[in-house]
Each structure stands twice: as C-alpha cells, then as structure tokens.
C-alpha cells in the first residue's frame, strides 16, 4: 500500500485526461500539399532587388517601372514623368530672377556716423555713393534704394542718441573742458623728503649691507694678557705650549701666563720612552725548548761553532783530536786496517748519500 500511495499520482489520475492535439500540415491548414481547395490569400508584392528588368517583357502602363539604371533617367515614349516633379526653368536657373532686389554691399572700412549739418536723405544718398557698387542682380530698383535709406535713417537715429550721450559726458563737471580745481593736502609737504631706506632682504650677502657701528661689550680678562699670536718669544716656546700639543692646544682666548724660566724645562710626556722589559732567564719556548732570550717572540736558535779550518769534502786540514775527525790507525799485526766510523765521509756531511 505504501508504494501505491507514493506513486499513485504519477499516472492513475491522468488516465483518459491527456491533451488533445490536432496535427497541422507543414504548410498550414490551407496548404495545397494535401490537395486543399480553399482559395489562397493574395500576398503583398515583394520587390526582388537582385533581378534585372532589362530584358523583361513589357508590363502594363499602370505597373511599368520608369526608373532605369545609370546616372541619367529616361522615359519611354508615351510615358508621363513621375508625379510631384517640378518644372525647371532654364532661364531662371542660368540668369537668375529678372526682378531680384538690389543688395548693396556693406563697406566695413567707412563709418556711418555723420559729421556736419546733412539731413537724413542726403546722408542716405552719400552712403549709397560711398559703397563699393557691388550688386547681386540688376540695378535700378527703387525698392532696394528705399530699404537702404530706411536702414540708414535708423542708424542715424541711434548715432544721434549716442552723440547726445557723448555731449552730456563731455559737459560733465569732471571733464577736460571743465576741470575741478585740486585742493592740496596739508599733510603733504611741498619740499620732498627722503624716504626711509629699504631694508635689504635676508638673502643679501653681509658685504652688501652698509656697515653700522655696533657697541662692543666688555672684553674678557684673558684677552688683556695677549692680543697677538706672536707675542711670546719663540726661543722659550716648546711643544708643550704650542698648537701641536693635543693636550694643551695653543689658543688666543685661553692662554696661560708667562713661563717661569727658573723652573727646569722638562720634556713632554709623549717624548718619554717606555722602559725595556726585564729578561726572564727561565723563559723557554715550549715547542723547541730553546730560550726566548728576553724578546718575548720566539728567540733564536743557539749558533753552533763550526771549525772551518779543514776541507769537509776531502777531510784534510782538520785538527786531530776532535770528535768529527780521527786519523786512520794502521794495524801493528799487518792485517786489515781498522776503519774509524767517525771519520768524515767523502763529500762531507752535507752529502745526500749519508
């Protein structure tokens, strides 16, 4: 029961309740694939832009295409031009309109402000005469002249207003024609007075600043003793009271009194030599066993006295009686002589054979 209750909603409630679907033809219900006799709805005319109509058959007059390829457009005989096209007048296009108003060119180099007693009409005529004479179209039109005269009249009205303002400004109490008398300031003197000298900026060198007498304070008592470096006698100077002494440098500010000549001149401490270390007779080198001889470094080996009277190669010339050389003793029995092993070998003791 558990399995049935868990899965009964999958298919049991949907039996007989499936969706009702109606299959349609690939081309629709009115497609002629299945032999339908229903009338087709007319489709809108779609222009094929890839097709050419040069060699096409002649169409009806109502559907004929009058536009041909190329920069120029031609029309068939009997065809009317397209609607909405205006007629072109060659005369107006080439020579302009016959009744075109005159447009006088403005002369920017001349001023329109009139000076003198001319009236408005004379000023307008003078302005027409001073123009460059360039006109667009045919001259002799009275309307253009009247328009220019009216514009000149407006300019004269504006200029007259500005001239009146200029006249009022020129008659003001502060103008040049009516100057206001100046009143002298009583605080300002008539004679010029020198001003306070400017303080130089801090970056100016001291040599550029003018010298000023500055009061010097009390002189220390030590400076009264010596005021020059060569005051003392050079004969009584020593290294102890000179500038080369590191312990007592020679200074002008702190100087000692004159030296007492009754005291003996003792040498400086840096000139004294240290006493030599006493030699210990029992000091020996632990490696060689020789004495250090008091030098504390290692000592020297004792020199062995050598007898240089004989020839070490041949053995001749040595004094008899020494341990290093013995004469050969011949046997009294006449036998083989006894060779002393202590004799000097041939080649000497320095030979590599021995």
Curated annotation (Swiss-Prot):
Entry-annotated residues carrying Phosphoserine: 30, 112, 141, 152
Region (Disordered): 85-107, 135-187, 222-257, 287-354
GO BP of this protein: positive regulation of microtubule polymerization
Positions with biased composition (Low complexity): 139-152
Location in or out of the cell: Nucleus; Cytoplasm; Cytoplasm, Cytoskeleton; Cytoplasm, Cytoskeleton, Spindle
Modified residues (Phosphothreonine): 41, 99, 103
InterPro entries: JUPITER
Molecular function in Gene Ontology: microtubule binding; structural constituent of cytoskeleton
Similarity comment: Belongs to the MAP Jupiter family.
Record keywords: Cytoplasm, Cytoskeleton, Microtubule, Nucleus, Phosphoprotein
Organism: Drosophila ananassae
UniProt biased composition (Basic and acidic residues): 85-94
Transmembrane regions: none
Biased composition, class Polar residues, residue ranges: 153-180
Name under which the protein is recorded: Microtubule-associated protein Jupiter
Keyword rRNA-binding: no
């Amino acid at each position: 029961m558990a399995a049935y209750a868990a899965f009964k909603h999958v298919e049991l409630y949907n039996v007989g309740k499936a969706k009702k679907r109606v299959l349609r033809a690939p081309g629709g219900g009115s497609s002629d694939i299945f032999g339908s006799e229903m009338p087709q709805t007319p489709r809108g005319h779609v222009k094929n832009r890839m097709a050419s109509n040069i060699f096409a058959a002649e169409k009806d007059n109502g559907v004929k295409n009058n536009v041909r390829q190329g920069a120029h457009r031609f029309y068939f005989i009997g065809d009317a031009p397209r609607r909405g096209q205006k007629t072109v007048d060659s005369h107006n296009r080439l020579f302009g309109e016959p009744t075109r108003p005159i447009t006088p060119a403005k002369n920017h180099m001349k001023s329109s402000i009139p000076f003198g007693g001319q009236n408005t009409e004379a000023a307008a005529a003078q302005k027409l005469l001073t123009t460059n004479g360039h006109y667009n179209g045919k001259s002799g039109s009275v309307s253009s002249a009247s328009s220019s005269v009216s514009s000149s009249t407006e300019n004269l009205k504006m200029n007259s207003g500005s001239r009146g303002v200029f006249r009022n400004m020129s008659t003001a109490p502060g103008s040049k024609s009516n100057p206001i008398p100046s009143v002298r300031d009583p605080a300002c003197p008539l004679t010029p007075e020198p001003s306070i000298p400017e303080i130089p900026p801090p970056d100016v060198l001291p040599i550029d600043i003018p010298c000023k007498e500055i009061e010097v304070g009390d002189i220390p008592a030590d400076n009264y003793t010596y005021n020059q470096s060569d005051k003392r006698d050079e004969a009584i100077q020593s290294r102890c009271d000179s500038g080369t002494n590191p312990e007592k440098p020679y200074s002008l500010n702190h100087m000692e009194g004159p030296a007492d000549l009754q005291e003996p001149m003792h040498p400086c401490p840096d000139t004294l030599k240290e006493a030599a270390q006493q030699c210990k007779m029992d000091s020996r080198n632990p490696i060689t066993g020789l004495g250090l001889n008091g030098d504390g470094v290692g000592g020297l080996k004792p020199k062995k006295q050598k007898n240089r009277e004989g020839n070490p190669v041949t053995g001749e010339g040595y004094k008899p009686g020494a341990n290093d050389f013995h004469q050969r003793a011949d046997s009294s029995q006449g036998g083989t002589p006894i060779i002393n092993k202590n004799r000097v070998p041939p080649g000497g003791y320095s030979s590599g054979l021995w």
